[in-house]
């Protein structure tokens, strides 16, 4: 009995004596934004083998709703998995997740809907947020990491609304747009009336939606139809409908599908 007791004591000591260290998949950047006049956080996933001393460069995927408790972890996992040589649906990429402070403010433009104005008085800050992306976030990432000129944006719901606004007004900001379940009901679907600004760069655009109700599905279809008419001949437009997924889980499946549409043909 004493021997058994001593065995468990020794086993317990061995377990507690193991070294424990922090597990990290990238960097957490705290930056002061002059444009937004507030502190913002960026989460950065780096590909396996990334070295700041290497001459190898990587495309960058910018993820809205990019905190650890939102979409950063699972999207970074998709990028890691999809870039394995035996999967090869997306190139090795840096993922930049932009943590939210107020998505109602940052992802929406002005609205004529008085109910929304009263309920969410902070709405209407998308122009400042887009400037923050274009002037501060891009500059920081390009100055501190080994990046190429290729940029992808991923946005869902209100994030999809913002990605749509950028696509229509400043399409040169990104090469690839993954727009999932965009909240185009906002401001009486006025974004669908914006004439898309043209850019010389080739664009790849993916619009996806799940089984999320008539309003959301119809708005996504209208956006896809609008883009078919307004995109250049050499632009690429893809569509995804996920009947078995709803607003809560469609992003994960749609992003994987978008990667296959965008990059799988480049194998």
Regions found by a protein language model. Name each.
Residues 1-21:
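Bacterial Sec-dependent N-terminal signal peptides
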Residues 17-59:
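A domain-start/cap signature at the N-terminus of enzymes
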Residues 67-130:
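Active-site machinery of serine-nucleophile hydrolases
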Residues 100, 178-186, 211-212:
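Active-site nucleophile loop of the alpha/beta-hydrolase fold
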Residues 131-149:
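Conserved acidic catalytic loop of the alpha/beta-hydrolase fold
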Residues 145-156, 177:
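Alpha/beta-hydrolase fold nucleophile elbow
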Residues 155-159, 163:
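Gly/Ala-rich beta-loop-alpha elbow adjacent to hydrolase catalytic centers
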Residues 206-208, 213-267:
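C-terminal catalytic histidine-bearing segment of alpha/beta-hydrolase fold enzymes
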């Amino acid at each position: 009995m004493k021997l058994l007791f001593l065995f468990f004591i020794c086993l317990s000591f061995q377990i507690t004596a193991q070294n424990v260290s922090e597990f990290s998949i990238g960097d957490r950047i705290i930056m002061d934004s002059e444009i937004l006049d507030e502190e913002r956080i960026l989460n950065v996933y780096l590909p396996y083998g990334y070295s700041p001393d290497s001459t190898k460069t990587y495309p960058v995927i910018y993820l809205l709703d990019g905190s650890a408790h939102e979409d950063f972890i699972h999207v970074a996992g998709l990028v890691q998995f999809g870039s394995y040589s035996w999967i090869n649906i997306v190139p090795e990429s840096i993922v930049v997740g932009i943590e939210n402070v107020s998505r109602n403010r940052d992802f929406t433009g002005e609205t004529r809907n008085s109910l929304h104005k009263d309920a969410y008085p902070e709405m209407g800050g998308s122009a400042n947020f887009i400037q923050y992306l274009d002037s501060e976030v891009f500059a920081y990432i390009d100055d501190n990491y080994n990046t190429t000129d290729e940029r992808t944006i991923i946005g869902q719901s209100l994030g999809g609304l913002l990605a749509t606004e950028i696509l229509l007004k400043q399409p040169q900001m990104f090469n690839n747009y993954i727009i999932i379940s965009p909240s185009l009901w906002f401001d009486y679907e006025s974004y669908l009336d914006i004439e898309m600004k043209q850019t010389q760069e080739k664009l790849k655009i993916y619009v996806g939606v799940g089984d999320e109700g008539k309003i959301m599905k119809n708005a996504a279809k209208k956006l896809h139809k609008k883009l078919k008419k307004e995109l250049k001949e050499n632009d690429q437009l893809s569509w995804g409908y996920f009947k078995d997924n709803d607003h809560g889980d469609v992003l994960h499946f749609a992003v994987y599908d978008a990667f296959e549409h965008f990059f799988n043909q480049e194998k």
